[in-house]
């Protein structure tokens, strides 16, 4: 039986709709000590700088336009089989990192390596081959609202493989069972809750058994029970499949509970700290403490930079 895999990129289908079923992920190794600076000084090379590194961000600079730099000279490595959370304020480049790993954007300077190969947006054949090994859970699910739960999960299997319908059926039901929704297979997307929709999107993201799963804000907009379910699924799927998981989130407690390694970013991708969850939670560094404890003022100021009160209100001192 042929299982020929088609290039994995922008999938076309489902009544003319387009879906990006790309996926990525990468975690960090467990370290006993918190690091205040980037953990690796990566230089261009044919192989990853660490024997177990699956993804390497190598002195990457990127901006969506010339007027604003999102990431500036960022270097990171992600090891196989771990859950790594990337935390930080809005606009610090967390989601942009995922897009660079998946080849959605190309770095202005530096490079991204996946399993030793440069992620080159110009080399479509190689990029599709790399993306075939990645899975992505989007923040808003990107589900087809006019299809059933079953057909949403089956979509990448139909688009990217030549599997028989009976095999597709079995795979879809197994993936839905893994996220606790096998019984919801025939429901329409309009009939499911937000938390269920997130789990359906996860089942679709793992339909092709990716080596890397990238989660973009997987806890956003979920109630406490759904949030706990999502966190448990991320950790369990990682442990059962041996995948590498990369979680971008603002939710500190959930990420600390499921991660092997945590990276805290600031403006332009500056690495504030990285280490085990315990190391960051017990850090005495003021910037780290402010973020993990949610303190309103500290190194990250409450007030946006402005002229003095005397200047704005015409008060003479």
Describe these PLM feature segments.
Residues 213-216:
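Catalytic Walker B motif of ABC-type/P-loop ATPase nucleotide-binding domains
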Residues 188-192, 196:
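Conserved ABC ATPase signature
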Residues 118, 165-184:
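Conserved ABC ATPase "signature" region
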Residues 102:
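Helix-to-loop junction immediately C-terminal to a conserved catalytic motif
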Residues 209:
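Conserved catalytic motifs of ABC-family nucleotide-binding domains
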Residues 119-135, 165, 280-283:
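ABC ATPase NBD coupling module
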Residues 110-118:
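Conserved ABC transporter NBD signature motif
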